[in-house]
Every structure is written in structure tokens, then in C-alpha cells.
């Protein structure tokens, strides 16, 4: 017992603690003030200024399209940061549940399933973190270095800040650039760590379903007196042991359902904003492709639209895998030697089957089911919006 499952989230929570959205159990007064100030200045105020800037933009469609692409990304990061702050108790309850007695095991095969889920979680974090940091470095820090060395004109990495008068642009260039750089970097870290945290808790949920599947297929292995006659003491002992095992499986299944319910409650708003903004971002990227631009900008757009598509597709993919694994529970139940067991065992077995007939699902905003069907619908809506914009543009 005591197998630690949540240590794969140590790096996620450490970075989120630095960013002010995941305090320790008893945070100091300094950290509380730091957290509120940092989140307000570089997340809330950042999006407010970005929104206000649309009023001052030149009346050019391609400029609006460019600004909207990053705007939806920043709104998504804001929703993730605020959700982690206000729904922190649910996230903590979820982590406590992973460390509860119900989800612990000493079986070597079951430990390997959990270890595999943890390794997968860290693998996705490393890939996402590496790509995001590289892209952020090219977008934010490389232009500044080139500006210092070769005196190339420095442009803001995210938002134009068109509300700054021309006579004051030189004065506010470096402070505004620094502010945008810190803001977009923190948003990148919010996105990376919260997105991969969601994938990690889903991987562990699927690992628990795999463990439950394995237990159900072997639930009658506790019966050692297979040839004992009906009504004998040995037969009664075997039936009693089998009933105890199936009851443990029912409790385990209930715990997995409760755990997935906590995932939905903690990430419902995040998923809703992710899917809504994802559709808008893909639409605006497609729309921007129809306008003239430099080659390097088209390369950037291509990479960006691929990343945004994956950001929506990956959780949908594993949401479908979660549904499939929970649906397989009903087949695992009948793979055990249940026919010679007592009536009470069969009654409990039927109860578990009735519960498992409704697969475990996760929804975003009580609207978007986390599945590949939802991903297809999002892509279809993105193209529909794009076609509508093209129709308006050509008139």
C-alpha cells in the first residue's frame, strides 16, 4: 500500500505555484498577495487591455483577424488560471482520491498499469513543454535579441497596442514589450501545465478502469473448491469469498465514477472555453490564409493551426478512450466463471452490469462531450464559420 500516484504532477503543480494559482496548504501572506497581484496584472488586466485595443485598431480585416487569433488563446489561458483558483478544492479532492485506499494496490501487474499511465503523463508534458518553450522563445525573445544586435525594428510579440499615441511609442516600447513577454510566457505555462494535468488525471482514470477490468475477469479466482457439491461448507465459503470480491469491484467502480465526476466538475469550464475558443482560432487561421502575407507568416500560421487542432483533438481522443474502457467493463464481468456461483453473487453482478451499461463520460460546460465526435463537430463548425466569413468578404 501507499503507492504514490500523484508524484507525476509534481512539476505541473510546482510551476502553477510559481504562477500564483496553486498555493500550499497554509500559504504565507506574502504569497497570497503575490498570487493576487500576479494573476490580476498578467492575466486579467492583460486580457482587458487586449480587449480594449480592438477599439483602436485600424479598420482592416486582416489586422482584426491576426489580433483575434492570439486573443482567443489569451482568453483560454485566463479561464484556466481562474478555474484553477476557484475550483482548487475540487482538484485537491481529486488528488486525495488518487491517494485513497481504494486506488492503492500491491499487485505487480496493476502497479505497472499505474506506472505506465504516469510515464505517459510525463511524456506528454515534456513534448508539450519543449515545443511551447521553443515557439515562445522564437516569438518573444529572438526578435528582442535581433533588435539589440542588428537594430531591427522591434514589434510587440502579441498585441499591437494601437491605443498608444505615436509620439509616445518610443517611450513605452520596452516596458510594453516586457509586459507582453511576461504575460504571453505565463499564459503559455498555464496552457501547457493545465492541459497536460487534465490528460494526466484522465490517464490515471483509464489505468483504474484497466485494473478494474483485470479484477473482474479474475473475480472468481478466489474460489478454490470448484468441484465442491452445492450446499457444502466449502461451496458456501467459496460463494462468500466471491461475493466479497464482486462487492469490492462494485465499490471500486463507484470510486472511479466519482473520480471522473470530480474531473468534470473541475475542468468543465476549462473544456467549454477550450472547445469554443478552439473553433474560433481555427476559423480565424483559415480566414487569415486567404489574405496576403509574408512567407514566414504563413509558416507560422500553419504551425499554429496544427497546434490548435491538436490542443482540441488530444483530450477528445482520450475522452473517447475513457468511454471505450468504461464500456468494456460489461464484457469483463462475463469473462469470469460466474455460472456456478450463488444467487447473491449473480444479483450483484447484474447490478454492476446495469451501472456499467452507462459509460463514463466527461463533458465541458455540460454541453461538449469529450469525444472524437465532438472534435469532428468543432472542425465542421470552424469550416462553416470560415465559409461564412469568406462569403461576407467577397461581397
Predicted stretch roles:
Residues 1-68, 100-202, 217-235, 269, ...:
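Helix-loop-helix junctions within predominantly alpha-helical proteins
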Residues 93-103, 211-214, 218, 248-262, ...:
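Short amphipathic alpha-helical coupling elements at transmembrane boundaries
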Amino acid at each position: 500500500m501507499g503507492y504514490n500516484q500523484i508524484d507525476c504532477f509534481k512539476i505541473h503543480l510546482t510551476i502553477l505555484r510559481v504562477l500564483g494559482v496553486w498555493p500550499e496548504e497554509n500559504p504565507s501572506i506574502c504569497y497570497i498577495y503575490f498570487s493576487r497581484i500576479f494573476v490580476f496584472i498578467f492575466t486579467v488586466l492583460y486580457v482587458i487591455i487586449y480587449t480594449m485595443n480592438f477599439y483602436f485598431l485600424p479598420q482592416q480585416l486582416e489586422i482584426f483577424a491576426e489580433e483575434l487569433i492570439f486573443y482567443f488563446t489569451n482568453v483560454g489561458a485566463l479561464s484556466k488560471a481562474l478555474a484553477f483558483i476557484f475550483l482548487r478544492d475540487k482538484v485537491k479532492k481529486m488528488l486525495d482520491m488518487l491517494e485513497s485506499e481504494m486506488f492503492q494496490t500491491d499487485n505487480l501487474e496493476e502497479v505497472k498499469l499505474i506506472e505506465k499511465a504516469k510515464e505517459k503523463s510525463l511524456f506528454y508534458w515534456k513534448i508539450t513543454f519543449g515545443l511551447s518553450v521553443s515557439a515562445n522563445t522564437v516569438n518573444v525573445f529572438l526578435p528582442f535579441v535581433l533588435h539589440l544586435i542588428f537594430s531591427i525594428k522591434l514589434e510587440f510579440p502579441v498585441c499591437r497596442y494601437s491605443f498608444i499615441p505615436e509620439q509616445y511609442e518610443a517611450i513605452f516600447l520596452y516596458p510594453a514589450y516586457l509586459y507582453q513577454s511576461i504575460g504571453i510566457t505565463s499564459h503559455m505555462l498555464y496552457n501547457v501545465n493545465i492541459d497536460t494535468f487534465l490528460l494526466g488525471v484522465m490517464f490515471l482514470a483509464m489505468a483504474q478502469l484497466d485494473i478494474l477490468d483485470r479484477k473482474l475477469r479474475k473475480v472468481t479466482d478466489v474460489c478454490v473448491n470448484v468441484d465442491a457439491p452445492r450446499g457444502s461448507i466449502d461451496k458456501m465459503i467459496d460463494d462468500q469469498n466471491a461475493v466479497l470480491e464482486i462487492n469490492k469491484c462494485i465499490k471500486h467502480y463507484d470510486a472511479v465514477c466519482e473520480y471522473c465526476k470530480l474531473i468534470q466538475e473541475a475542468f468543465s469550464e476549462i473544456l467549454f472555453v477550450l472547445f469554443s475558443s478552439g473553433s474560433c482560432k481555427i476559423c480565424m487561421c483559415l480566414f487569415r490564409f486567404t489574405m496576403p502575407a509574408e512567407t514566414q507568416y504563413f509558416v507560422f500560421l500553419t504551425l499554429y493551426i496544427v497546434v490548435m487542432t491538436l490542443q482540441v483533438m488530444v483530450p477528445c481522443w482520450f475522452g473517447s478512450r475513457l468511454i471505450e474502457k468504461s464500456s468494456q467493463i460489461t464484457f469483463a464481468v462475463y469473462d469470469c466463471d460466474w455460472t456456478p456461483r450463488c444467487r447473491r453473487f449473480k444479483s450483484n453482478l447484474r447490478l454492476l452490469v446495469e451501472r456499467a451499461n452507462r459509460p463514463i463520460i466527461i463533458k465541458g460546460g455540460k454541453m461538449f462531450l469529450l469525444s472524437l465526435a465532438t472534435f469532428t463537430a468543432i472542425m465542421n463548425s470552424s469550416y462553416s464559420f470560415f465559409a461564412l466569413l469568406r462569403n461576407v468578404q467577397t461581397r
